[in-house]
Amino acid sequence: MSDLVKELLKTVDNSLSVEGANVKVLDAAKFRKNICKLVECSALASDSTAGWSRYLIRSAALELGVIPASIHELYLARGRGEAPMTFTVPAFNLRALSYHAARAMFRSAKKINAGAFIFEIARSEIGYTGQRPAEYATNILAAAISEGFVGPVFIQGDHFQISAKKYMADPQAELQTVRDLSIESIGAGFFNIDVDTSTLVDINLPTVPEQQKLNCELSAQLSAFIREHEPQGVTISIGGEIGEVGTNNSTEPELRAYMDGYNVEMKKLAHGMPGLSKISVLTGTSHGGTVLADGSLAKVTIAFDVLRDLSRVARKEYGMGGTVQHGASTVAEENFNKFVQNEAIEVHLATNFMTMFFDNIPADFKKEMYAWLDVNSAGDRKPGMTDEQFYYKARKNAIGPFKAKSYALPEAELAKLGAAWEAQFDKLFNLLGMKDTKQVVDQFITTVKVAPKLSNYVKDAVESEDVSDLSD
């Protein structure tokens, strides 16, 4: 055993043992108490210390019944009419202090026996939050261990998106970047991946099938690639998307054109293999919302009937779980139960939890982050922008550079932030029908203990990429 590993075991009071690549939990209570030290090593170290910390947590999680899982079977059960229509699965993008936020989420879940919820991170967020997939998954699994949660944990790659600009410059290089990210994520325990090639939809073409052609073909190519690399016994939940967030609402002809084209391509590339479990559609939202001059957000009007009508087509015609709503953090809370009423299978939430981070951190720390943005994100300041609009749009860029200082916040400040997040999770879980969904998860989800590969964790660091044109 290397000195490095011995030192890491000391940080958790020797509650784990390591022989070669085999990890055993010797004292679960002691490990739970000290796991936060490994989390900090995972997040802040830049060498093999980070890799080993992640590997130890992933391995211990399996032994403690915290199992990365795919939600595919549950979604297909909804498509068959076997799973109840009483809930919409929330998918949370935890950008800042992900471990602390996930702990709050697991606390909320345990109060009401919830199990059907997802932790996700987008390709763009991996860049500006400074969290590679293995680090993000480590934060989530460690949070589950800390809070005594047992069962399937759904970790998702959100918007594994093709950059239209980069694709036009070099199609194969851009596709390979998403393939590589998929491989990296699967190795880290991401068994749910949202493939997003909707950036390549061309609405200037004369017919809907022509507009969606490149989207469905590339979605199928990436899906076939994921199927080829998914672990034995695991069917990764793959989501597709028929349009980027923002402009015109999605239509049934678009959904049918995309799915029909996708299914034709999948038969060629991966005959007999499962396809999509869900589909993301446009209903009038935008990522992050529209910020007004005073820093407040414009009210969002969602076409809930689009979610309902297209969910029904997705289930009845294509066997999927239904439609997915992106950019929902800025939707009025009183409307959240409408996602359930209108049969959405999944809803994505990110911005509000980042807003709560900035609203709850000490004023001096926030001022320091904003001063950094003045210098390092000056290019994001558009003519006519107020300070409030600029900071709202640019502040996410400070999360990665200030990660270490975020971890170093006093315990009282971290507790205050955790309590605020927990109260919000409580509210959203109630509105989205999460009570007793652990029973539904246990009924339909098959868990497979996929042993992590040490070589996926202890290797050269992956350089960050320019993701400024990608969606969150």
Regions found by a protein language model. Give the residues of each.
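Alpha/beta catalytic barrel-like cores
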Residues: 1-157, 163-166, 170-174, 180, ...
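Hydrophobic faces of well-ordered beta-strands that scaffold small-molecule active sites
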Residues: 88-95, 117-121, 151-159, 191-195, ...
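Active-site-proximal loop/turn and secondary-structure-junction residues that shape catalytic pockets
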Residues: 98, 121-125, 159-163, 197-201, ...
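Alpha/beta enzyme core
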Residues: 103-116, 134-138, 142-147, 169-318
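Histidine/acidic-residue-rich catalytic or RNA/ligand-binding cores of hydrolases
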Residues: 166, 291-293, 332-342, 357-368
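Catalytic cores of alpha/beta
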Residues: 170-181, 330-343
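Glycine-rich phosphate-binding active-site loops on the catalytic face of alpha/beta enzymes
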Residues: 197-202, 336, 342-361
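Active-site pocket-lining/capping segments in soluble small-molecule metabolic enzymes
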Residues: 258, 264-268, 280-287, 348-377
